């Protein structure tokens, strides 16, 4: 009888150990799943920041909205915005110009004449996978002094 209780104890301990290992495996699976999700979000945000910074530099280098379109257009990935002055450009997941890409960059171009020159207000919004809310938004302004004033 004593041998039987030792074997039963062994089975109970083994069963408890298996349950503990299964719980640990489930917990680690959830942790790694959440880490993968956070990594994907971080990659999207990083890509959006790069695209918005590039757009801000293009705004600074442009005299007109047409110049901005010429700077952002590669492989026919950019086109003028229909509802306001500005440019929409599309990029793939590796940030290469692609008309059907996952990233959409909308850059507004709102010039305002002042007594000394022109102030251009611009907003670069990056959306991913046709989402309504932008992943990243960057406001920028540039001033061009009029020659002879």
Where are each of the predicted segments found?
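Positively charged n-region of N-terminal signal peptides that target proteins for export
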Residues: 1-5
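Hydrophobic membrane-insertion alpha-helices, especially the h-region
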Residues: 17-28
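Flexible, low-complexity segments enriched in proline/glycine/serine and punctuated by aromatic residues
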Residues: 6-10, 16-19, 33-149
